Amino acid sequence: VLLNSWWVPDEVSYGLENSEAKILIGDEKRLRGLEKFTELRKIVVRPMNNSAGLETFDTFIESKAESFSESSLDTNDNATIFYTSGSTGFPKGVLSTHRNILATLFSWALVTTLKKEVEAAESNAGQVSISDGAPVNQSAILHCVPLFHVTGSHSGFLMSIIAGRKMVMM
């Protein structure tokens, strides 16, 4: 569950309760005001002074096993919850299954591949290609959309992983 980092504490509290989150990873500013969540494991990234003595992300990562245990997942199992803007009250949690996400990514990959093939065929019509060993341009993306939105998560972040393109995160 990716929560909007611009939310005020009441909205964050709502998202945590609604999603039944067990762990919260955030910076000190985002973790302030959430003391009432005593059952929630809070992990701080980029600690400035960590006056609350929270577990740091580095410690959290170092304490984990070298390998993951196998989990039984079905393609129709829920994978993510993204929250709407909440224009008519509190934000609504929108579920996506593993199948939803993979179908979206594969359809984008297919469209992108087909588009490149068509463009290459059109631009190379009647031309002879000779390789001179010149470096090939690397595909890259300047990622400026928040990861808590499906556009940033899926079309920016996940598609970049599938496409093998360089990501520059803002």
Residue ranges and their predicted role:
Residues 102-143, 148-170:
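Conserved AMP-binding/adenylation subdomain of ANL enzymes
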Residues 65-83, 90, 116-120, 131-140:
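Conserved pre-ATP/AMP-binding loop-to-beta segment of ANL
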